[in-house]
């Protein structure tokens, strides 16, 4: 099974009051062509679909058309929300569009969502961890001591039964310690949003978003 991993589309972004939507539309067409040429079975979109939590109608229409083209040949699409997105907005109609092969992380309810895919030799489980602030996790898991982003993610992962007999992929939109940043990301003061990569050791592949530079962290997969 072949996966195409992307993130941080930031649809609707402007530069000096100039809309980038025409350029973004051209890039999305290229991505669809890459997915077709590489015969990708699924596409992983790891957060920050939109530039704003309340995206303009044109940006939403562009993303809708993009996803529709991706799934037209039976391809699966997995989407999580990032720090720029509104989880309720991203996940609107999520239960309905699952029938089309589009899986969107819903607003956090205390557990992490997953989808199991059948492959030729072993099942593949795709886990979806949207961007979560410590306060969001604390609200759902009041018994946990949560002060940092790492505390929050670890609390969620402790409640996640990852089966090592299966192949496990995680979509995640957080800042991972050791990643190389560019000048376009939003960071928390003092590095409070840092999460150590070792917390994800149970997963075979972690599809990261949030950092606007392709890279590998700790290990090759």
Predicted regions and their residues:
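A structural signal for short coil/turn segments at secondary-structure junctions
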Residues: 38, 74, 163-165
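Glycine-rich beta-strand-to-loop/alpha-helix junction loops that act as flexible
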Residues: 45-48, 80-83, 208
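Residue-level recognition of the N-termini of beta-strands and the immediately preceding loop/turn
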Residues: 42, 77, 166-168
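His/Asp/Glu-rich metal-coordinating catalytic cores
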Residues: 55, 85-221
């Amino acid at each position: 099974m072949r996966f195409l991993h992307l993130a941080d589309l930031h649809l609707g972004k402007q530069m000096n009051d100039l809309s980038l939507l025409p350029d973004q539309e051209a890039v999305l067409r290229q991505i669809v062509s890459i997915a077709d040429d590489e015969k990708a079975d699924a596409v992983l979109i790891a957060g920050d679909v939109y530039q704003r939590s309340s995206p303009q109608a044109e940006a939403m229409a562009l993303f809708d058309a993009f996803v529709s083209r991706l799934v037209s040949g039976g391809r699966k699409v997995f989407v999580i929300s990032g720090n720029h997105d509104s989880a309720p907005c991203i996940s609107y109609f999520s239960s309905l569009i699952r029938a089309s092969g589009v899986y969107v992380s819903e607003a956090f309810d205390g557990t992490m969502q997953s989808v199991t895919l059948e492959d030729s030799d072993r099942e593949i489980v795709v886990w979806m961890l949207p961007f979560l602030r410590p306060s969001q996790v604390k609200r759902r898991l009041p018994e946990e001591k949560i002060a940092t982003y790492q505390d929050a993610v670890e609390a969620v992962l402790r409640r996640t039964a990852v089966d090592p007999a299966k192949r496990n992929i995680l979509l995640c939109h957080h800042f991972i310690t050791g990643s190389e940043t560019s000048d376009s990301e939003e960071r928390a003061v003092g590095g409070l949003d840092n999460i150590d990569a070792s917390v994800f050791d149970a997963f075979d592949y972690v599809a990261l978003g949030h950092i606007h530079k392709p890279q590998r962290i700790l290990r090759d997969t």
